[in-house]
Amino acid sequence: MVEPNDNGSTIEDVDVAAIRRHLAATDVRFALLFGSRVRGNTHESSDVDIALRFPDELSPTERFRRRNRIDADLQGYADGFVDVSDIDGLPLPIARAALEHGIRLVGDDAEIDAYHERIDAEYEETAADRERDRREFIDRLAKGDI
């Protein structure tokens, strides 16, 4: 995980300090800024990607409701569209990339590290399946089935 921008200023037209203040007032376990804004390779249609981790005890409906509320609230803190995701609902490779390269907005480093270890283990366990799917896709492309 990339270290947070300690001065709390903006990253590519994102008011990181304001987003941190807002998220600190919620019950998210942690939040990460990730994607093109962190990598520094934005273009005019780039959005602002934020992954949230909610408490485990929340129902799927409550997680959805809270994510939508936070998503709406954060729109004013960036020039582009803010795309807020529940990290538990992200595809495994994207969640892993957010944990590897993202910037911590709020949350405890130990909790983020523990979740990262869990995602890494799951990623390794499913490597053969991903490789099989990739090869099948390439074969279908070569045959003109896609």
Please provide the spans of the model-predicted regions.
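Catalytic core of pol beta-like nucleotidyltransferases
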Residues: M1-T26, F30, R39, E57, ...
